[in-house]
């Protein structure tokens, strides 16, 4: 059996923890990505919901993918350093197409602040500010 292809080689994540499936758009300060929520996804609970922690991780991966794209696709190790005003506003369930939108607010050198939100069918299901930090 062939290994699944990584659509985001610039992220250090591998299946099953690579949550994003597709790049929809990348601009100068923002990016839009897609996660297809499947019953086969090991992150999905027995109740068919994607837990808030994984929604937050998808937002962080969107920020990392945007940074890598802005750096010419260069993979840069980093981590989620801070989460502010994060709110879950609805459920994310099997069958949903989770749209991940990130907008870069400030770049502090080694740390970047984003406003991030997750939407399903145009409805915001989660949002907040996240900070990603790079060790270099």
Locate each region found by the language model.
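Short aromatic-glycine motifs in intrinsically disordered, low-complexity regions
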Residues: 2-14
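Catalytic strand-loop segment that frames the active site of acyl-thioester-processing enzymes
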Residues: 15-51
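Hydrophobic core residues within well-ordered beta-strands of beta-rich domains
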Residues: 17-19, 98-99, 112
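Hydrophobic residues on conserved beta-strands that form the core of alpha/beta folds
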Residues: 20-21, 83, 113, 127
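A residue-level detector for short acidic-glycine micro-motifs
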Residues: 22-25, 85, 90, 104-106, ...
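HotDog/MaoC-like acyl-thioester-processing domains
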Residues: 32, 93-94, 103-136
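Compact, glycine-rich, soluble single-domain proteins
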Residues: 46-67, 80-81
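Hydrophobic beta-strand-centered segment that forms part of the acyl-chain substrate-binding groove
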Residues: 63-101
């Amino acid at each position: 059996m062939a290994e699944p292809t990584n659509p985001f080689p610039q992220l250090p994540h591998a299946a099953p923890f690579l949550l994003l499936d597709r790049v929809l758009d990348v601009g100068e300060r923002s990016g839009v990505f897609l996660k297809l929520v499947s019953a086969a996804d090991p992150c999905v609970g027995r109740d068919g919901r994607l837990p808030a922690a994984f929604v937050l991780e998808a937002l962080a991966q969107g920020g990392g993918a945007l940074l890598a794209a802005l750096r010419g696709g260069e993979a840069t190790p980093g981590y989620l350093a801070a989460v502010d005003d994060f709110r879950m506003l609805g459920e994310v369930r099997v069958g949903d197409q989770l749209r991940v939108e990130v907008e870069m607010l400030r770049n502090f050198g080694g740390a970047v602040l984003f406003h991030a939100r997750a939407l399903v069918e145009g409805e915001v299901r989660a949002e907040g500010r996240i900070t990603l930090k790079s060790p270099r």
